[in-house]
Amino acid sequence: MMEPREAGQHVGAANGAQEDVAFNLIILSLTEGLGLGGLLGNGAVLWLLSSNVYRNPFAIYLLDVACADLIFLGCHMVAIVPDLLQGRLDFPGFVQTSLATLRFFCYIVGLSLLAAVSVEQCLAALFPAWYSCRRPRHLTTCVCALTWALCLLLHLLLSGACTQFFGEPSRHLCRTLWLVAAVLLALLCCTMCGASLMLLLRVERGPQRPPPRGFPGLILLTVLLFLFCGLPFGIYWLSRNLLWYIPHYFYHFSFLMAAVHCAAKPVVYFCLGSAQGRRLPLRLVLQRALGDEAELGAVRETSRRGLVDIAA
């Protein structure tokens, strides 16, 4: 964010690095293809969760994650177009800066939501009685709204301190805010990994040791997906803005992995919820991926309607 130019600045840069242009174009083309697939997948998840799937707390989390990934991929695909066209197309500075800031904003939102849903799923597994009886009804909605609001505040502070949107940028304040963002990223990663580890230990220490399935299994797979595919983008972005040294090839690698991270989530949802040897509608597949809670909610709703019909 300290440098508005992002796309196109690495290809052919005068830093003495020997780049294989053909290899870079292949990586960028793969990134665009994965981004397009991710847009379709997250769009399907967004549509199904907002219209067809029974609303439960975890579905609301996935709805917000899909929304953040959808915006991220849209900005991601547009931002690398100048690299893909090898400088034949260039964006104005304010467009590049807007794409960069919006992309990091959605990245932090998605990571924060993953940490929140990991903690809530861990609490549901460790304290099932308390979770069923004492959990505030609108906790998920409040957590999601607060996450978007706090990430938007960080986004505005970084935009004000590091760009010329709101006046002259302050280099010292900008670096301080990026250090805060780095600490936030580390805390979110530790929280997410700690909650997932406790959830895994809880499942393994159960009486029959069943394999993680349903929504707990989905959370564990999503966390692993972030650590291997989503984290490199955050490391690159923070290193770039804090002027830390990073290998030159890490630029294309982190962008490709970010596209893999967002595009693979819908695949994980649908694969985990699909039944072997059976063809199910996407709505039922996604409902199965949400786990027993969604199915229990649907059963309760059906039972309540049956009682109403009998009483009538």
UniProtKB/Swiss-Prot annotation:
This is Mas-related G-protein coupled receptor member E. Disulfide bonds: none annotated. InterPro entries: GPCR_Rhodpsn (IPR000276), GPCR_Rhodpsn_7TM (IPR017452), MRGPCRE (IPR026230), MRGPCRFAMILY (IPR026234). It is found in: Cell membrane. Keywords: Cell membrane, G-protein coupled receptor, Membrane, Receptor, Transducer, Transmembrane, Transmembrane helix. It is a multi-pass membrane protein. Orphan receptor. May regulate nociceptor function and/or development, including the sensation or modulation of pain. Belongs to the G-protein coupled receptor 1 family. Mas subfamily. Its main location: membrane. Pfam families: 7tm_1. It comes from the Eukaryota. Residues 1-20, 81-106, 163-176, 239-241 are extracellular. One of its GO terms (cellular component) is plasma membrane. GO terms for molecular function: G protein-coupled receptor activity. The chain crosses the membrane at residues 21-41, 60-80, 107-127, 142-162, 177-197, 218-238, 242-262. GO terms for biological process: G protein-coupled receptor signaling pathway. Residues 42-59, 128-141, 198-217, 263-312 are cytoplasmic.
